[in-house]
Amino acid sequence: MGLSHSHSVETRQLVEKTGFSAEQIEHLHKRFNSLSGDLLTIRKGHLNGISDLEVNPIRSKIVDAFFDKRNLRKGSSGYVEEINFEEFLTIMSYFRPLSQNMDEENISVCRKDKLRFLFNMYDTDNDSKITLEEYRKVVEELLSGNPNIEKETARSIADGAMLEAASICVGQMEPDQVYEGITFDDFLKIWEGIDIETKMHIRFLNMESIPSCR
């Protein structure tokens, strides 16, 4: 799409859909073109080439999130092969800075959207819960860059975190009771009181240089 400072109908529609300002959309369109090489779509390979992601231990999960149909609000599981600029904006909207005049209801919606995005990164098999094995894998990946932490230690950390999640969400469990995994409602409880609204950002796409939404 061609964007200009004369707010086109298409740009206004994107403003309404994503919550970004026209100025922010212009900035992100330049970044999209830089990533895609001025093509109309980007694929995983375009994001894999971002230097800031090369040392990120969960790079593959971050890249996959851009192509996850759940995050693209397509209402189904699986991944798309490529995304266009509007779909790119949809993903970037999860990282959109909060507006200073945003009311409590909109802040709550924004928070829930961000947490759903994170939940989807953990819930790799799309069964609506994060199992112990899924959580272990993420923890192992996060700690893989630390040579002083062995795999078994990472597994123990994941196991402990899952037990804590169970105590928060279920309470006192019976000795023979099995916690099958973290549901999205559980996930909301675990993150309660944590300021995800302002902490969740995306550094490798230069979001810091984008003005906050008005």
UniProtKB/Swiss-Prot annotation:
Kindly give the Pfam families that the UniProt entry links to this protein. Answer: EF-hand_6
**Keywords for this entry?**
Calcium, Cell membrane, Cell projection, Cytoplasm, Differentiation, Lipoprotein, Membrane, Metal-binding, Myristate, Nucleus, Protein kinase inhibitor
Example GO biological process term? Answer: protein localization to plasma membrane
Query: Which molecular-function annotations from GO does this UniProt entry contain?
Result: calcium ion binding; magnesium ion binding; phosphatase inhibitor activity; protein homodimerization activity; protein kinase inhibitor activity
Q: Which InterPro entries match?
A: CHP3, EF-hand-dom_pair, EF_hand_dom
Instruction: Provide the lipid-modification sites (N-myristoyl glycine).
Output: 2
- Residue sites binding Ca(2+) per the record: 123, 125, 127, 129, 134
PROSITE patterns on file: EF_HAND_2
Record GO cellular component, one term: ruffle membrane
Every EF-hand domain range? 110-145
- What is its membrane topology? Lipid-anchor
What is said about its interaction partners and assembly? Monomer. Homodimer.
Record remark on domains: Binds calcium via its EF-hands. Calcium-binding mediates a conformational change. Can also bind magnesium.
* The protein's role, per its UniProt record: Functions as an integral cofactor in cell pH regulation by controlling plasma membrane-type Na(+)/H(+) exchange activity. Promotes the induction of hematopoietic stem cell differentiation toward megakaryocytic lineage. Essential for the coupling of ERK cascade activation with the expression of ETS family genes in megakaryocytic differentiation. Also involved in granulocytic differentiation in a ERK-dependent manner. Inhibits the phosphatase activity of calcineurin.
| Family recorded in the similarity comment | Belongs to the calcineurin regulatory subunit family. CHP subfamily.
Could you identify this protein by its name?
Calcineurin B homologous protein 3
